[in-house]
Amino acid sequence: MIGWLQGRVLYKQNDQLLINVCGVGYELTVPQSVMASAQVGEELTVFVHHVQREDGQFLYGFSSFLQRQLFRELIRVSGIGPKLSIVILSGLTPEALIAAVRAQESAPFLRLSGIGKKTAERLLIELHDRVEKNDLFLCDESESSRAPIALSASEEAIQALIALELAPAEAELWVKKAQKTLAEDADSAALIKTAFALRLQGAK
């Protein structure tokens, strides 16, 4: 599963981003806070929620670990899917959402498109205990919960191969084989290219 990505923004529109990570384009659905910080041609790092279904794979990107965790709690609420969860996180900061749930205050939710009184009440009821019992939601977001700066070249290569539908163990195996044939300072692009070549050759 893809947990986070760092790459160059190629395209942005509405709630959709396309970023280039080591030559692989990833499409993500993101809240407006991420969209506002994304600039075409510049680097962007996001935490990712990766959904695999019969009709395809879907990626949702977030500015912090906390925001992603809130998304995961929101989609567990009855009747709240990924689309509406993105709307909620576009209209409320993580801190504002947590504060509203703790105070059982529906007004912030009612101001958002697609949320009526019954939905707001259901959100407050179902999220309350989860917010109160999860230490992540009981304290301010720390530096350690924000998106990390960079992956190592090998980690980037493994992640790219997994995105291309190799099993994690297989991706790691071929990247390790590639490392043995390349210089120690080989970048992720070289590792990906060599790993694919070795795999095609059936290297053992």
Swiss-Prot record:
Keyword DNA damage: yes
Localization, UniProt: Cytoplasm
UniProt GO cellular component terms: cytoplasm; Holliday junction resolvase complex
Record's keyword terms, sorted: Cytoplasm, DNA damage, DNA recombination, DNA repair, DNA-binding
Region (Domain I): 1-63
GO biological process: DNA recombination; DNA repair
Chain segments carrying region Domain III: 152-204
Region (Domain II): 64-142
UniProt keyword annotation of Cell division present: no
GO molecular function: ATP binding; four-way junction DNA binding; four-way junction helicase activity
SUPFAM superfamilies associated with the record: Nucleic acid-binding proteins (SSF50249), RuvA domain 2-like (SSF47781)
Residue segments, region Flexible linker: 143-152
Record's subunit section: Homotetramer. Forms an RuvA(8)-RuvB(12)-Holliday junction (HJ) complex. HJ DNA is sandwiched between 2 RuvA tetramers; dsDNA enters through RuvA and exits via RuvB. An RuvB hexamer assembles on each DNA strand where it exits the tetramer. Each RuvB hexamer is contacted by two RuvA subunits (via domain III) on 2 adjacent RuvB subunits; this complex drives branch migration. In the full resolvosome a probable DNA-RuvA(4)-RuvB(12)-RuvC(2) complex forms which resolves the HJ.
Domain-level remarks: Has three domains with a flexible linker between the domains II and III and assumes an 'L' shape. Domain III is highly mobile and contacts RuvB.
Family per similarity comment: Belongs to the RuvA family.
Function: The RuvA-RuvB-RuvC complex processes Holliday junction (HJ) DNA during genetic recombination and DNA repair, while the RuvA-RuvB complex plays an important role in the rescue of blocked DNA replication forks via replication fork reversal (RFR). RuvA specifically binds to HJ cruciform DNA, conferring on it an open structure. The RuvB hexamer acts as an ATP-dependent pump, pulling dsDNA into and through the RuvAB complex. HJ branch migration allows RuvC to scan DNA until it finds its consensus sequence, where it cleaves and resolves the cruciform DNA.
Protein name: Holliday junction branch migration complex subunit RuvA
Biological source species: Dichelobacter nodosus (strain VCS1703A)
